[in-house]
């Protein structure tokens, strides 16, 4: 799993690539949390899932956990460009009612 992040103005973009599953989630969580903490002045966090090749319920839990953390900082969170497979998992879970898709 690869995590890349960059801040542009008041927006923190987080790009995830690979599989979000039980084996990778702890490393991904640490990297994303560190990026959020380093950019605590951002107003929005946009998580790009275009290159996520696999995601199960562990990925949903990961996103909800990041959403809660981001809320504590007073930021908004959005999901961007989920691929077809990730989009199906997220839509069925109902997560888009909590974290809007761009």
Could you tell me what each predicted segment is?
Residues 1-2, 102:
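Absolute protein N-terminus
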Residues 2-3, 37:
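Short leucine-rich amphipathic alpha-helices used at interfaces
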Residues 4-30:
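STAS-typified acidic loop motif
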Residues 22-98:
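Amphipathic alpha-helical interaction surfaces in cytosolic regulatory modules
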């Amino acid at each position: 799993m690869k995590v890349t992040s960059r801040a542009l103005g008041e927006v923190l973009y987080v790009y995830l690539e690979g599989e979000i599953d039980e084996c990778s989630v702890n490393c991904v969580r640490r990297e994303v949390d560190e990026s959020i903490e380093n950019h605590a002045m951002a107003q929005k966090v946009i998580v790009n899932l275009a290159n996520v090749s696999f995601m199960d319920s562990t990925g949903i839990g990961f996103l909800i956990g990041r959403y809660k953390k981001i809320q504590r900082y007073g930021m908004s969170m959005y999901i961007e460009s989920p691929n077809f497979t990730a989009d199906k998992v997220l839509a069925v879970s109902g997560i888009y009612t909590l974290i809007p898709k761009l």
